[in-house]
Design a protein with these regions (language model features):
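Catalytic core of nucleotidyl cyclases, primarily class III adenylyl/guanylyl cyclases
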Residues: 186-188
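C-terminal substrate-binding subdomain of Rossmann-fold SDR/epimerase-dehydratase oxidoreductases
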Residues: 200-338
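N-terminal Rossmann-like NAD(P)+-binding domain of SDR-like oxidoreductases, especially those catalyzing
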Residues: 1-183
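Pocket-edge positions in alpha/beta enzyme catalytic cores
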Residues: 57, 96, 144, 192-196, ...
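Short, basic/glycine-rich phosphate-binding loops at helix/coil junctions
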Residues: 182-184, 221-222
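Residue-level detector of secondary-structure boundary/capping sites
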Residues: 24, 150-151, 195, 263, ...
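Short-chain dehydrogenase/reductase
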Residues: 97, 146-154, 190, 194-198, ...
Length: 338
């Protein structure tokens, strides 16, 4: 069975390719490489000893998608492709709506044409309203997003749910990720953001390796145990395995289902910093600065449904995530560029 992975050269996509290949699936990737490096796919092949069929191009290119479906017997699509920086989405809303919504519309149009109606969407905890009680369950309130990135995820969920509702032959699985960090234990693959990292862990590792002077912690006056923001951090390999479980589910069921992929445990920014320094025996200079607009105090998942329905549970600890992130960065100081 072949799986088409859009955005498959990216951080989560490439780790998912490893788990799919290791589970016996064939993998076809389309990626325009706007925020990814094709070296990641070479590493996927090295780790698995299996071939990835790669098409460089944009998911909004209908002709290319038709070619991919004509040349490969695809049974399921995992749709990662999209722009993903919250702050940038506020500055460039048009680009985010154009990219993140139109990729889905073009992709599902071609899928409908060829009669292949199984799709797993890379959604996000940003679809949940900020005023929910914790932990977040799949039925917690959605909408009321605080930035265009979150709205594109919310709108894409609505598009896919609507398609599935109108045509019962569709199988739609919406995976709401929490905060993916970590790297493959081999140290061959990890997160390699372009420019200044938007996420906490790559910033930490770049400070630790000497590429950046110090870490800025945004706010220490939140109503949490140490005043810093609390999030549900999940190891990227656990997250990737969740996608394999979702493929099995999507190819055996119809309709729309939503799953949280998180650990169910919240850790603060300072918990992360202190754990990273402790397990890796490195110093991490940091400064406390003002809060970032749009950040909430606490966000963590209730992953019970994923365990019950998908048979999936996150296995890796925060210490594992910190250790694997540093292993990747220390072996690849410039990411895939070296």
């Amino acid at each position: 069975m072949n799986v088409l992975v859009t955005g498959g050269a990216g951080y989560i996509g490439s780790h998912t390719c490893v788990e799919l290949l290791s589970s016996g699936y064939g993998v076809v990737v389309i990626d325009n490489l706007c925020n990814a490096n094709p070296v990641s796919l070479e590493r996927v092949e090295t780790l698995t000893g299996k071939k990835v069929t790669f098409y460089e191009g944009d998911v909004r290119d209908e002709g290319l998608l038709r070619k991919i479906f004509a040349e490969n017997d695809i049974s399921c699509v995992i749709h990662f492709a999209g722009l993903k920086a919250v702050g940038e989405s506020v500055e460039k809303p048009w680009e985010y709506y154009d990219n993140n919504l139109n990729t889905t519309l073009v992709l599902t149009k071609v899928m409908k044409e060829v009669g292949m109606k199984n799709i797993i969407f890379s959604s996000s905890a940003t679809v949940y309203s900020a005023d929910n009680e914790m932990p977040l369950k799949e039925e917690s309130r959605t909408g009321g997003c605080t930035n265009p990135y979150g709205w594109t995820k919310y709108m894409t969920e609505q598009i896919l749910s609507g398609i599935s509702h109108a045509d019962p032959d569709w199988s739609v699985v919406l995976l709401r990720y929490f905060n993916p960090i970590g790297a493959h234990k081999s140290g061959l693959m990890g997160e390699d953001p372009r420019g200044i990292p938007n996420n906490l862990m790559p910033y930490i590792t770049q400070v630790a390796i000497g590429r950046r002077e110090k870490l800025s912690i945004y706010g220490n006056d939140y109503p949490t145990h140490d005043g810093t923001g609390v999030r549900d951090y999940i190891h990227v390999v656990d997250l990737a395995k969740g996608h394999v479980a979702a493929v099995k589910y999507a190819t055996g069921n119809k309709g729309t289902e939503v799953f949280n992929l998180g650990t169910g445990i919240g850790y603060s920014v300072l918990d992360m910093v202190n754990t990273f320094m402790e397990v890796n025996q490195v110093e991490l200079p940091y400064q406390i600065v003002g809060r970032r607009a749009g950040d909430i105090a606490v966000c963590y998942a209730d992953p019970a449904k994923s365990k019950e329905v998908l048979g999936w549970t996150a296995q890796e600890t925060l210490a594992d995530m910190c250790r694997d992130s540093w292993n990747w960065q220390s072996k690849n100081p410039q990411g895939y560029g070296e």
